[in-house]
Design a protein with these regions (language model features):
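Iron-sulfur-cluster electron-transfer modules
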Residues: 1-60, 64, 68-85, 89-92, ...
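Beta1-alpha1 glycine-rich phosphate/pyrophosphate-binding loop at the start
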Residues: 1-25, 29, 101-104, 110-156, ...
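A short, basic/flexible loop-to-alpha-helix module at the beginning of a structural domain
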Residues: 58-61, 98-111, 192-199
Length: 261
């Protein structure tokens, strides 16, 4: 629901939908089939014999014995702590998805002068979104020599708004104690190490991080599912069954997909 931009459904429904419209199609399908579901419910454990333990306000702690379990936990954003960026920890540093939720669902402005690290699709879309909300996006920096987002998003979100994209660049310092006051970018070589003398300072009050997604597999690991080092998701057979009998995986928990369709 926080993805209020369009571009969804082109492959599945053969029409262009916003995120909430796309989600509503599947909600309607579930209701039409009268499939029971529980909202605001957190699964805290799945055993190898497929007993699912969950908790919510209405039922408290409860368990369900399943004949089959489908893992569909999705993925999460890589946090700042995984990036080893020097500097203080001031206010004004957000993952792109957090900023997206704050702006689109909570109605909060996260900043006025913005630098974005990473050119994943969420980061590119947020560059456009923040520009439309009146913020100034100074630059989008990408560590790799190529963008991590779709070509159409580079054109529609950066080129159309004159937002510069610096490839083979990364943030090497964050300035500011209470609030971000600026960041220093530098060019990196093929070994991804900073090239001395290429530092550039950008004054800003906000840094958005769009540095990749990680399949959410804590539950998978807890039940002993084998994880692929290539995808960070479960290893599956041709039927998408994991190494645990009767447990299947799909979607972004299996591997990060470029398109929701």
């Amino acid at each position: 629901n926080q993805c209020i931009h369009n571009g969804f459904g082109l492959h599945t429904f053969k029409e262009e939908l916003t995120g909430p419209e796309y989600a509503a199609r599947y909600i309607d399908m579930i209701q039409e089939e009268k499939i029971p579901f529980k909202l605001n419910t957190m699964v805290i454990d799945i055993s190898r014999d497929r007993v699912v333990t969950a908790v919510n306000r209405e039922d408290g702690l409860f368990s369900v014995k399943a004949g089959a379990v489908i893992l569909a936990m999705g993925c999460r954003e890589r946090p700042r702590g995984a990036l080893n960026i020097p500097g203080y920890r001031p206010a004004g540093i957000y993952s792109a998805g957090t900023a997206q939720r704050l702006m689109n669902m909570e109605g909060c402005s996260v900043g006025r002068k913005v630098v974005i690290l990473g050119s994943g699709d969420i980061g590119l879309i947020m560059a456009r979104r923040m520009t439309l909300e009146g913020a100034e996006v100074k630059v989008v920096a990408e560590l790799m020599p190529y963008s991590g987002g779709l070509k159409r998003n580079i054109v529609q979100c950066l080129d159309d708004y004159g937002i510069p994209l610096k490839l083979s660049h990364t943030v090497v310092n964050i300035h500011g104690k209470r609030r971000v006051t600026g960041v220093t970018l530098a060019q990196v070589g093929t070994d991804r190490k900073m090239i001395p003398g290429t530092e550039e300072y950008y004054a800003c009050d906000t840094l958005l991080l769009s540095v990749g997604l990680i399949p959410e597999n804590e539950l998978s690991k807890g039940m002993g599912v084998s994880i692929s080092p290539a995808t960070s998701g479960p290893e599956v057979n041709d039927c998408l069954e994991t190494s645990v009998k009767g447990v299947f995986a799909c979607g972004n928990v299996l591997h990060v997909h470029e398109l929701v369709d």
